[in-house]
């Protein structure tokens, strides 16, 4: 790739005297994290203009289109005023990387100057310029550029003494692509493995053999001979197989035949597909019970881009949660923004299309921000990953007009190699679209294949296959993408209008694998497809046909359209400024055929493409670790411990993240992430209003506790699902009742992220034990979800979450996230977590047990323990139903679930921002603990699941006690004195100022206080 380095340039900088907050942040971070004294830092924007404009037009564009007249000064050509700066760094995008700001500036230029339309190619490019007061040497400037200001995978850097002219325009100049070629698979096994690795196919030897044997088939050879071609796959066909058969798309390990051996019991069982046994095996029986009782809200599960449930006769709710772990490890900002935008497209591409995104969620797992171990080559520091991912999620949601309403952050050293980035989206879809059921998908022979949205480039090539392997320093740059929220917003608005008008038969997104995936998945609906790649709009010339077909360039959808509607849909696209291209037709040939400039580059049998992948056979083992409870000192300071727990990274406030996300856009958020009189108290679940013509809403929550898996993955998975469910119950949700009429709809999404679990005697000798952990996690999911009657509607697995370099492997702990959404009949009856009034009674609901194993407290004490928290569904179901009934009757003033840190944390959090306190005696809790060795410690910090802290106004106390008495005990009152006072059968335990506790909780895990 080549670049133009002398375009016309417009510099937009803050005027002297205007505070440069970005520059101040850079100076602070450089000193704090890199130990570099930059002096004063000034920032500016550089816009390189490729069009031949007069100087007066350039000046007008800068003044009227790109700058604020009060805040900014504009310089055309040269550089911004240096004002004493001695060195600089320019951060621009590499050729071909998405430049949303540049494209927006280009649209502004066209509108402002009334320019004739171009050919769609980018003509304006944006960059950032940093001017430093200090005379910094080149090696220091390089560190600033690569470790703080940008990422070499996606950015171009220039630095040195401040020159007279600063300019950069990343135009792409690719050599002509190599012609399509045939790939000889009649080679040795070693050569097949080398081919798979070099082309980033991520296919194992058995799969390479299957492809080779397919092309040996006499019928296949005869069909290909009739096309006047040899019986060998083309490079495009090999890439299509790799995409379609990738772990990302085919979920081969979740569908494998697994021999599971329990070394503790000596029993061996065979699991024929984790998915069919434990996930579909959970939902299908629940669906049958719902159907038998006349409940019809479970509409579509597992067969589309997202799960669909019925809200009422007019509306459907669509839920999807995806992961974007590998891209976020390479480029945290780009990985996160493409993750959330890509996940938005899943609901948009469900059924016939026409959904409107309602909310986003994000759950993030990072290495600790103060990670002190030496970084491996290619490994980014967790602090940098955290900030990049946070910014990506912020821009992905805020700039798309979608509120980010719920989430969580988990810290653990084992996420320092590869973070886990879970992106969730809920959407509303009309029940009928274009006079037909909205959830149905269909394609007919002769229907047009349209591609709508962004153009295609090299970005994202091999994203699907690359996500199926561990990462290292040699991970391919082409797998990285950067999203465009503006392009996607236009695309979403266009799609909604076109679908509701009845112009679209169905749609799907161009996600992993691009056109190869979207057309390949839709083709069986009609019986075949024919695609012409020369009709696909490109960002730049020089892409090989196979690259065009598998590229994952973002913000694209594939539409199935009756040709009679083509003029109408193209007009809708014009009105929404969305590029739409007619790239082919669906057929009934039984083939996926791909052409470029008249030449056939792929002709594949659809049946073999989708069903020919060999099934895996895997081995899994389990043995419970030999653990004991620690011996603790007798003189522990409970108040000091509580402050430490509140300040710990996994418990401390997330306000430093929450305040940067927009959770209010759309005006439907009822229960927000932080509530209370001063917006400080953390909430258990988000509640949103569905519309403005009634009081119906929904609650969304999540559950994730990977640390429990260090003792027992079964207990971890069960606790995570219970957490997600009880958080919804805490705000006023009701458990579903599959055996009764008139139940409330629920939708749950499972997302498993595990390290490489495929056993290999030398490369992965403990793979069988990691797979054994996954089997236990899935078993727990089925047991708990079945007991609660909550169906799984969609999900995703990510199976290779490892970073390996120089013989060192950093693997994530087995992790599962459950995202759960439930209908709320009346949002006016929902409850928040903070206490409300002096004199209210305080209840602890659910039984506290001696279950400190893997707790936050034990982690702070450097212990693991043995008594892991375990879910007892028989107790939980009764409590959840009784609490929901009491909430519906208006008896509950506040309710907060007990989770990370236990009861003591829940009590403290319930007071935050209220100016109120609690006066409690935990005698009833101690009674339930029996002969626990450290009863007060367990009462305060045990993380037994299925528990709540609730408050009840005096006028409702008798009714509440009659309804909930068997499930909990009253332990005290809310007071006007802002102190947390706790006794144990009269003996003092805690007497703490709640403002001091709030201060501890607001510790910023990145370092410092004042979250």
Describe each model-derived feature in a short phrase.
Residues 25-82:
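Acidic (E/D-rich), amphipathic helical modules within compact regulatory domains
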Residues 11-22, 53, 90-103, 134-137, ...:
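Short, surface-exposed ligand-recognition loops at beta-strand->loop->(often short) alpha-helix junctions
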Residues 24, 28, 56-71, 99-111, ...:
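Non-catalytic interaction/regulatory segments
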Residues 69-118, 123:
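Short, solvent-exposed interaction modules
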Residues 96-98, 118, 131-133, 151-1011:
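Glycine/proline-enriched, intrinsically flexible loops and inter-domain linkers
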Residues 12-14, 47-55, 91-93, 129-138, ...:
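Short beta-strand-to-loop capping motifs
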Residues 39-43, 111-129, 133:
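Interaction-mediating elements
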Residues 3-16, 43-48, 83-95, 126-130, ...:
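Short glycine-/aliphatic-rich beta-strand segments at the starts of folded cytosolic domains
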């Amino acid at each position: 790739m080549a670049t133009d380095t002398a375009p016309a340039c417009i510099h937009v900088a803050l005027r002297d005297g205007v505070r440069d907050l970005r520059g101040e942040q850079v100076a602070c971070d450089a000193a704090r994290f890199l130990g570099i004294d930059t002096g004063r830092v000034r920032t500016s924007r550089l816009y390189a203009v490729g069009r031949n404009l007069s100087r007066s037009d350039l000046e007008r564009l800068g003044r009227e289109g790109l700058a604020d007249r009060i805040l900014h000064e504009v310089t055309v050509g040269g550089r911004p005023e240096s004002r004493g700066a001695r060195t600089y760094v320019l951060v621009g995008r590499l050729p071909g990387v998405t430049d949303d700001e540049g494209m927006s500036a280009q649209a502004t230029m066209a509108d402002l100057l009334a320019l004739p339309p171009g050919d769609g190619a980018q003509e304006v490019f944006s960059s950032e310029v940093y001017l430093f007061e200090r005379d910094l040497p080149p090696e220091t400037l390089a560190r600033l550029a690569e470790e703080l200001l940008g990422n070499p995978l996606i950015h171009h850097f220039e630095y040195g003494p401040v020159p007279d002219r600063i300019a950069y325009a990343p135009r792409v100049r690719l050599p002509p692509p190599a012609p399509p070629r045939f790939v000889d698979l009649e080679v040795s096994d070693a050569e097949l493995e080398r081919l798979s690795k070099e082309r980033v196919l991520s296919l194992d030897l058995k799969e390479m053999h299957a492809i080779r044997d397919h092309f040996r088939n006499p019928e296949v050879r005869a069909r290909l001979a009739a096309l006047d071609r040899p019986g060998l796959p083309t490079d495009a066909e090999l890439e299509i197989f790799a995409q379609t058969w990738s772990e990302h798309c085919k979920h081969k390990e979740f569908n494998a035949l697994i021999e599971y051996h329990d070394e503790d019991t000596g029993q061996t069982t065979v699991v024929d597909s984790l998915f069919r046994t434990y996930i579909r095996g959970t939902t299908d029986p629940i669906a049958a019970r719902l159907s038998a009782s006349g409940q019809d809200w479970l509409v579509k599960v597992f067969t589309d881009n997202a799960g669909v449930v019925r809200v009422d006769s007019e509306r459907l709710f669509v839920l999807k949660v995806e992961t974007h772990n590998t891209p976020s490890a390479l480029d945290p900002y780009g990985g996160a923004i493409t993750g959330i935008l890509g996940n938005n497209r899943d609901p948009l591409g469900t059924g016939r299309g026409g959904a409107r995104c309602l909310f986003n969620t994000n759950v993030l797992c990072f290495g600790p921000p103060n990670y002190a171990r030496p970084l491996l080559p290619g490994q980014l520091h967790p602090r940098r990953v955290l900030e990049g991912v946070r910014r990506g999620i912020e821009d992905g949601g805020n700039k798309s007009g979608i509120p980010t309403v719920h989430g969580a952050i988990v810290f653990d050293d084992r996420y320092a190699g590869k973070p886990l980035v879970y992106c969730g989206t809920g959407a509303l879809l009309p029940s009928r679209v274009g006079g037909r059921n909205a959830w149905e998908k269909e394609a007919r022979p002769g229907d047009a294949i349209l591609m709508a949205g962004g153009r295609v480039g090299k970005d994202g090539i091999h994203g699907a296959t690359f996500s199926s392997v561990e990462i290292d320093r040699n991970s391919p740059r082409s797998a990285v993408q950067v999203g465009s929220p503006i392009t996607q917003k236009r695309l979403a608005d266009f799609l909604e209008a076109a679908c509701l008008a009845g112009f679209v038969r169905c749609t799907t997104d161009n996600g992993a694998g691009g056109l190869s995936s979207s057309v390949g998945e839709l083709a069986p609906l009609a019986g075949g497809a024919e695609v012409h790649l020369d009709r696909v709009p490109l960002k730049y010339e020089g892409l090989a046909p196979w690259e065009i077909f598998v590229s994952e360039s973002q913000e694209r959808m594939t539409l199935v359209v009756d040709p009679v509607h083509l003029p109408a849909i193209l007009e809708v696209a014009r009105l929404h400024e969305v590029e739409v291209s007619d790239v082919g037709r669906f057929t009934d040939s039984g083939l996926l055929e791909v052409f470029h400039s008249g030449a056939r580059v792929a002709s594949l049998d659809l049946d073999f493409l989708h069903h020919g992948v060999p099934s895996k056979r895997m081995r899994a083992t389990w043995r419970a670790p030999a653990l004991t409870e620690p011996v603790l000192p007798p003189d522990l300071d409970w108040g000091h411990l509580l402050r430490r727990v509140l300040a710990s990274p996994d418990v401390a406030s997330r306000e430093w993240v929450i305040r940067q996300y927009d959770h209010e856009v759309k005006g439907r958020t009822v229960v927000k992430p932080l509530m209370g009189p001063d917006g400080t108290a953390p909430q258990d679940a988000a509640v949103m209003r569905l519309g403005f013509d009634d009081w119906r809403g929904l609650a969304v929550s999540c559950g994730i506790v990977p640390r429990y898996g260090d003792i027992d993955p079964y207990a971890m998975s069960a606790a995570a699902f219970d957490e997600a469910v009880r958080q919804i119950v805490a705000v006023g949700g009701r458990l579903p009742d599959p055996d009764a009429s008139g139940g409330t709809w629920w939708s749950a999404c499972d997302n498993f992220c595990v390290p490489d679990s495929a056993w290999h005697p030398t490369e992965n000798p403990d793979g069988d034990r990691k797979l054994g952990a996954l089997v236990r996690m899935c078993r727990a999911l089925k047991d708990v979800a079945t007991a609660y009657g909550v169906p799984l509607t969609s999900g995703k697995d990510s199976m290779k979450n490892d970073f390996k370099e120089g013989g060192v492997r950093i693997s994530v702990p087995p992790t599962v996230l459950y995202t759960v959404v439930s209908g709320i009949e009346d949002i006016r009856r929902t409850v928040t977590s903070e206490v409300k009034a002096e004199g209210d009674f305080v209840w602890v609901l659910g039984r506290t047990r001696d279950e400190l194993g893997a707790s936050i407290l034990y982690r702070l004490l450097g212990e693991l323990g043995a008594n892991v928290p375990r879910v007892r569904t028989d107790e939980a179901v009764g409590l959840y139903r009784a609490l929901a009934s009491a909430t519906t009757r208006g008896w509950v003033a506040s309710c907060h679930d007990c989770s990370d840190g236990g009861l003591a944390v829940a009590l403290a959090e319930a007071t935050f921002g209220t100016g109120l306190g609690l006066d409690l005696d935990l005698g009833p809790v101690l009674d339930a603990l029996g002969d626990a060795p450290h009863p007060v410690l367990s009462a305060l910090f045990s993380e037994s699941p299925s528990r709540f802290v609730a408050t009840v106004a005096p006028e409702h106390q008798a009714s509440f006690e009659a309804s909930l008495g068997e499930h909990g005990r009253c332990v005290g009152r809310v007071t006007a004195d802002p102190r947390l006072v706790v006794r144990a059968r009269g003996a003092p335990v805690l007497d703490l100022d709640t403002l001091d506790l709030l201060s501890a909780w607001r510790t910023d895990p990145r370092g410092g206080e004042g979250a």
